[in-house]
Amino acid sequence: VTASSDGVLSDIKVLDLSQGVSGPFCAKFLAGLGAEVIKVEPPGTGDSSRHSEPFLGEGDGVESSALFAYLNTSKKSVTLDLDIPDQARSVKQLAQGTDILVESYAPGYLESLGLGYDTLSEANPGLIYVSVTPFGQTGPYRDYKGGDIVAQAIGALMYTIGLPDREPLKVGGESVLYTTGISAFSAAMLALHVRDAEGFGQHVDISAMDVMTVAQIHSSINEQFGHTPVRRPTNLVRAKDGWVSPGLESGVQQGTWPKVCELMGVPELADDSRFTTQEARRTNQQDLLKVVGDWAATKPKEEIYHTLQALRTITGYVATVEDLLVARQLVDRQFFQTLPDPVHGDVVHPGAPFRMADDAWRLLPPPRLGEHNEEILNGRLGFPTRNWPKSLTLAGRSLSATTNKPALQGLRILDLSQVAAGPYATMFLGFMGAEVIKLESRSRMDINRGRAKPGPRDPRVYPDGEQGERPYNRTAHHVHRNINKLSVTLDLAAPKGKELFLGLIRVCDVLVENYRGSVMDRLGLGYDAVSEANPQLIYLKISSQGATGPEANYGSLGSTLEQTAGLASITGYEDGLPLMTNEVYPDPVVGILSFGALMAALRRRRQTGLGCLVDLSQREVTSMLLGESVLDFSVTGRVAGAMGNKHRDMAPHGVYPCLGEDMWVAVSAGTDDEWLGLCLAIGQPELADDPRFKDTGSRRANHGVLDEIISSWTRGSDHYRVMHLLQAEGVPAGAVLKGSETIVDPHLEARGFWDTVNHPEAGIYKQTTTPWILSKSPRQPAVPAAGLGEHNYQVLGGLLGLPTSEIDALVEQGITGDVPDPSA
């Protein structure tokens, strides 16, 4: 591997055989890092997404889809029919010179054409073969059809979204398919990291169901600890021009509430017992929202956002796609980029999902169908099989073998992150074999740990509701998100604590933190300081708004990110207000992407010998889930809104009641064949000839009638039974599962998705693992989350060489220890 100014993947060739959303999104990210991506499309029709709304111009030509244009930037397009043997052989020849192949066909289809992993890897042992499918390559559902709404249902993300008295609701747009693509990207980068080190390629198995089960970061663990999942009303209040989330129930510093009261012109409420503490404000949320709503009704939403953020609250506002393009933070960071289009003029695209040193993110216009046939098919085919670097041979490594050692063995991570996004990223690193040292302060523990001692009205979830003697070691979120980590405490405000921190920096490869913009700089421990201590260190900064810009010090929660990134503006019932997920959806998305960003930074270090700063904005990443709507608005001026559970291209597409209390099934029919299958499954084949439902447009126009017909059938059966009956007829469908149901789902069990953890203080529970399976780099077993400071002596003594007596003295001084500061 050699360094290049053209991107960390400039030496990598990618063959993109995928269609739709997830696989192409994965390949788009690889192209953004500099890889040459050759997209193979069917002649005439092209990728299925070329026919997906919204369209940038009149008609639905193959060059007009905003979705295709967004997903396929910086790629080359060739047309080949895989069912024609000569053309399949051309694909096989292309694969011989390929580093990464991405595909999304039904399991077994490419194998039947001689294009499966086993066949292609014989000629190209270093090939990384990424399969992205609804249910993965194994398990009883592997041949089932999927889609965005099906994955949200079967992965339990959907169950807690929406209002208590209505059907569960999907996250708007194609966001889940995008997240599946991000998982594929991160897994591909992991496999490339292994190949760079060991020489062999492997098969990467990505299942949208796995990804969504990872993404429901509350339900599965909370239900095991005795918490009942619910759909909750929103906490939004109406501003003059939209909606805001005041953010006064959590994350508010002591002393802020009186300032807010003064600002709102109600100073008398500063001492009102309903609102004086965070717990009181949570208990009296509706009264609080009434007070704030009266004040907010006459003010613009962004003014409220900036005013309250200046008081250190975690406030959000529901940004529309139109708002995003003029949001001052995104404009200042030049997140959106304009690309020329020969037909539609200038088209605005979301830019880089993360920033790595001064490396540019490659963003070029999407290809026209078959644009590169002459260059690739007529000019390049016939090139010799790839010559692997001699260094691999000299090292005596077999390209086809596996070492059976953990993928990230020898990599050491210092983890300062809290809450969800950062801990999720480092949890994945631990699962793949990295040594992760979680660093906290006794006075400022990870928020996931909760309280220093038991107390009343604690909103966190504990096993069977019992806080225990050490509640900080047994909260659901702590034990779930901090698997496979060591725990160390240091007071970073103390000179000795800073000295020891820099000592750890010198022996670590990666630092991960997700504080507000300038926190580490104020401590004197920002990137300049740590890179001076260790020039090879990779510093991953995950922040709400990014490391730069006028809002760099603004805070957020997953729910407010859904608002400011625009996701809430396209999520909701058709006749209602914007809604957020109850799974803080941006956090797992960012956690999964952060893993891939680190793999890219490690490859850059391999090339240059130097570490770097990786700047990842959670708002920017989340806004990428609305990519096609951004493009559409920039050309047509259309502002995307909520569609409930409906879809632009499919009908029927919704969630339907089943037998039992609050039981549901998600169903989507995107083709005439799937519609016919649905008619057969419900025992009404005559509907296939009904003029009201003759094509997708007719079915969309009569969606309400269809919903009644389908609901009358689904009500009489169990949600799993409905799913299986529909899938047997080739209809995409998924039971809307609770988190507790995913734990016993036979497909996830067959895929080995869950690990059983026996935590010394929280008991036995099932743990989510990783959103990928690598054929030669298995994940490591889950090791229970550590108690606070459990490894102080092991790490400070073993890594830094401190004698036990000195660590004892540090405990006496309060610089380290295994019990919280009483004020925590």
Residue spans of the language-model regions?
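Glycine-rich beta-alpha junction loops
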Residues: 44, 134-136, 208-213, 241-243, ...
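Oxidoreductase and adenylate-handling cofactor-binding alpha/beta cores
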Residues: 181-202, 214, 218-224, 259-267, ...
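A glycine-rich dinucleotide-binding beta-alpha-beta segment and adjacent secondary-structure elements
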Residues: 310-363, 728-782
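N-terminal helix-loop segment corresponding to the beta1-alpha1 unit
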Residues: 1-200, 223, 368, 372-610, ...
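A short glycine-threonine-serine/GTX helix/turn-capping micro-motif
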Residues: 168-179, 231-234, 243-248, 276-279, ...
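Aromatic-enriched alpha-helical interface/lid elements that frame and gate functional surfaces
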Residues: 233-311, 315, 322, 328, ...
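Short Gly/Pro-enriched turn/cap motifs at secondary-structure boundaries
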Residues: 68, 224-229, 234-236, 251, ...
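C-terminal active-site "lid" helix and adjoining low-complexity regulatory extension at the edge
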Residues: 347-385, 765-804
